[in-house]
């Protein structure tokens, strides 16, 4: 969805643990109540400053996991887009960084799937908006529309690292985790409403 899915996950994790962070776009640091939990990422990665920021975030994320903390990651680094109003929304290609981090820290993984999609106008314009301010304004607009509405999420079972250790290739591990996550869509038993 863009913002509200991250807020829901932070809220859920905070009920049982305080040692968590969420990797998200640096512009979301404006959410002051979440600032201490945000590991900022600059997805443009074009400038020296953005590269420096991303390296610092990667180091902090690795340290968090090595210390047994929880890291919330949206592996595509973006918002799922539907090709048309009748289609489901799907992620862009998943980044390989989460797979690298999993292998480096030998961490377990909990897949979570959010059911639903943003409004029609969002999907019509999402791929066309180049201006970052307009793009993030559209995320805020979608978030406001969802306040007070039901959002269904599917929470999978923890995948122990020993079960995925043999998937040495980052591509292979990423594909496996993506498949496991999208399978959750059909797992009604573990469906939660927030």
Whereabouts are the PLM-identified features?
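Non-catalytic C-terminal accessory region of glycerolipid acyltransferases
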Residues: 54-194
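Catalytic core of membrane glycerolipid acyltransferases/transacylases, capturing the structured
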Residues: 1-50
